[in-house]
């Protein structure tokens, strides 16, 4: 039995439990608060490479009001914690994608938007196309479509929020 468990078994804490208060370990509480805060304030950075970027801009417009979900687009990778890769990733652009990903602060998440970013799309058999951005950076959410609608990207962002709330494990990457 650890020190924290001994404190929680104390008669003083038992009185709080009897009155209906939730008594938990401090580390569990901190972890819950961090998950809630991370999921409620996603700051995506756009990495638009092709026509999917137009739909990404459409999602950021006032019709969908991403601010109510705590989602605010940032231009700098140092201020963002989510990168949305939208469009065809070429071999020449892959090192730049990795460099931008490395500049993001931890924890960082990646959303792959559209068929081209997911697996090469229409240009899959071209010699100069990377067959999925997951070969360069780890991807958390895949949004299918060519191009995916603004609603599909919004659903992907909400799925990322749920993923962060469900499990905080695996969100810190090197």
Swiss-Prot record:
Compartments in which it is found: Cell inner membrane
Binding residues for [4Fe-4S] cluster: 51-52, 116, 146
Cofactor: [4Fe-4S] cluster
Gene3D superfamilies: 3.40.50.12280
Pfam family name, one: Oxidored_q6
Functional description taken from the UniProt entry: NDH-1 shuttles electrons from NADH, via FMN and iron-sulfur (Fe-S) centers, to quinones in the respiratory chain. The immediate electron acceptor for the enzyme in this species is believed to be ubiquinone. Couples the redox reaction to proton translocation (for every two electrons transferred, four hydrogen ions are translocated across the cytoplasmic membrane), and thus conserves the redox energy in a proton gradient.
Subunit structure: NDH-1 is composed of 14 different subunits. Subunits NuoB, C, D, E, F, and G constitute the peripheral sector of the complex.
Protein name: NADH-quinone oxidoreductase subunit B
Name of the coding gene: nuoB
